[in-house]
């Protein structure tokens, strides 16, 4: 399959035309309108420093269904002991920067370039991007962030500096989405970590069918408030 080049027009090629590795197109911009249109069509931006802006729609797609998150006994004990205090949308900028910084310090490099960080902070200010924070004694110990549209939460990244802090944040997100009757959490691509917590791969065509139906629901904009496990 060819890789398409985007013009200034606010349009994407069909995600079914993506290459076998999931790469669909390059170019365009990171305006809020384009990013939201991408998610509505099962597409997301992902590129490294020095690369052109790349857009992806992998097949299969990893998802977690709200209410089916797998919580280990050790994690449940931490939750029961209130090791972490959970908040939502209280430190979005700190969470997204921590996700980028942790990968850089680990030597993995990061796709969270400054342009991406600024774009998602802009989406947070518009009420579409959300963060979940896990605090320990007033210190931000872990968290995650993503985009909410309709009944879908499109997860982007998470970080952890203390044991099970990001897992606790994910468990809190799952509980919140169950209460709000969300349909799925998009995890994009398979990782052993997410599979161990209940992530399942589904064909892209099934993923697109699910999100297109779920996007008929009203988008619940932020700030979100966590009401407990």
From Swiss-Prot:
One of its GO terms (biological process) is protein catabolic process. GO terms for cellular component: cytoplasm. The keyword Transferase applies. Its EC number is 2.3.2.6. InterPro entries: Acyl_CoA_acyltransferase, Leu/Phe-tRNA_Trfase, Leu/Phe-tRNA_Trfase_C, Leu/Phe-tRNA_Trfase_N. Gene3D superfamilies: Leucyl/phenylalanyl-tRNA-protein transferase, C-terminal domain, Leucyl/phenylalanyl-tRNA-protein transferase, N-terminal domain. Keywords: Acyltransferase, Cytoplasm, Transferase. It is found in: Cytoplasm. SUPFAM superfamilies: Acyl-CoA N-acyltransferases (Nat) (SSF55729). Functions in the N-end rule pathway of protein degradation where it conjugates Leu, Phe and, less efficiently, Met from aminoacyl-tRNAs to the N-termini of proteins containing an N-terminal arginine or lysine. Belongs to the L/F-transferase family. NCBIfam families: aat. PANTHER family: LEUCYL/PHENYLALANYL-TRNA--PROTEIN TRANSFERASE, LEUCYL_PHENYLALANYL-TRNA--PROTEIN TRANSFERASE. This is Leucyl/phenylalanyl-tRNA--protein transferase. It comes from Desulforapulum autotrophicum (strain ATCC 43914 / DSM 3382 / VKM B-1955 / HRM2) (Desulfobacterium autotrophicum). The gene is aat.
């Amino acid at each position: 399959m060819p890789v398409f080049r985007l013009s200034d027009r606010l349009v994407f090629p069909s995600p079914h035309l993506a290459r076998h590795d999931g790469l669909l197109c390059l170019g365009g911009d990171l305006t809020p309108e384009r990013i939201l249109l991408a998610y509505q069509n099962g597409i997301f931006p992902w590129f490294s420093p020095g690369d052109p802006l790349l857009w992806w729609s992998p097949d299969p797609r990893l998802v977690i269904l709200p209410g089916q998150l797998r919580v280990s006994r050790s994690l449940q004990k931490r939750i029961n002991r209130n090791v972490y205090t959970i908040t939502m949308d209280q430190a979005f900028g700190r969470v997204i920067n921590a996700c980028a910084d942790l990968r850089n310090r680990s030597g993995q490099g990061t796709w969270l370039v400054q342009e991406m960080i600024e774009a998602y902070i802009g989406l947070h200010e518009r009420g579409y991007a959300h963060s979940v924070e896990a605090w320990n004694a007033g210190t931000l110990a872990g968290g995650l962030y993503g985009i909410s549209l309709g009944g879908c939460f499109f997860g982007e990244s998470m970080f952890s500096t203390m044991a099970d802090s990001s897992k606790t944040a994910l468990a809190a997100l799952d509980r919140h989405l169950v209460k709000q009757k969300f349909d799925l959490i998009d995890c994009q691509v398979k990782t052993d970590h997410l599979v161990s917590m209940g992530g399942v791969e589904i064909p892209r065509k099934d993923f697109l069918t699910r999100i297109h139906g779920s996007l008929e629901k009203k988008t619940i904009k932020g700030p979100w408030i966590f009401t407990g496990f």
